[in-house]
Amino acid sequence: MPYITKISAQKNNEERVNIFLDEKYAFSVDLDVLVKFDLRKGKELDELDIIEIQYGDDVKKGFKKALDYLSYRMRSTKEVQDHLKKKGVADSAITEILHMLKGYKYLDDREFAAAYVSTHRKTSGKGPDVLFRELKLKGIDDELIHEALSSFSFSDQVEAAVKHAEKVLKKEKKLSSKETKQAIEQHLVRKGFSFDVISAALQETDYENDDGAEREALEKQGEKAMKRYGYDGSYETKMKVKQYLFRKGFSIDLIDQFLDEKG
């Protein structure tokens, strides 16, 4: 049975040592593993001992990788698991590492979900539907997601949706009232808000143009349509412009008035 003939510190990593069996280099381990397995000069090691020691060292190395990954921000269990797999850590070691991390409270999917909802609803303005999908991708259970989202009240959602709507209004000044409403709805759906929240937000948003603003928007869209269809006053080009403006949400009366003025 081989025995340890030498233990030497590594030059480039003071936390690791090299183990020599029968005067030949065998493997290296973390100092904590050295202590855990009581490795010392003269100790005999059989094949199973070596396998167990190397497994313990794999766990220790993986644990350090996980701590480094967690040092930047909170992570879900799945995020850490995926990271360790990419780093080449064995599945059996990952299972033990995750258990250790949870035991030390470095991993807690309930706290992660709550923090994720709190942060992203404020910084990115995301609605519940988007937050739910993102947390699912991070491996959070449905029950924990719903629990985290319960802090995002209906009134808070409407308030957030109204802020989004106001941003759309500032950006889309050349649209008809109908198109502006559609733009707001589409934006809020993409952000992850429910139709009930969107409906409530629209009631608190002044998206309808006054007569002057609607006419100004129509003229801008009308000039654009005339260039596109080569408007020459003919029935054919007039109908193309008319259909274009109608699809944009302008009233027939306003469109006819515009075209009559253009001749």
Curated annotation (Swiss-Prot):
Keywords: Cytoplasm. It holds the Pfam family RecX_HTH3. It is found in: Cytoplasm. The keyword Cytoplasm applies. One of its GO terms (cellular component) is cytoplasm. It comes from the Bacteria. GO terms for biological process: regulation of DNA repair. InterPro entries: RecX_HTH_1st, RecX_HTH_2nd, RecX_HTH_3rd, Regulatory_RecX, WH-like_DNA-bd_sf. The keyword Cytoplasm applies. Modulates RecA activity. Belongs to the RecX family. This is Regulatory protein RecX. It comes from Bacillus licheniformis (strain ATCC 14580 / DSM 13 / JCM 2505 / CCUG 7422 / NBRC 12200 / NCIMB 9375 / NCTC 10341 / NRRL NRS-1264 / Gibson 46).
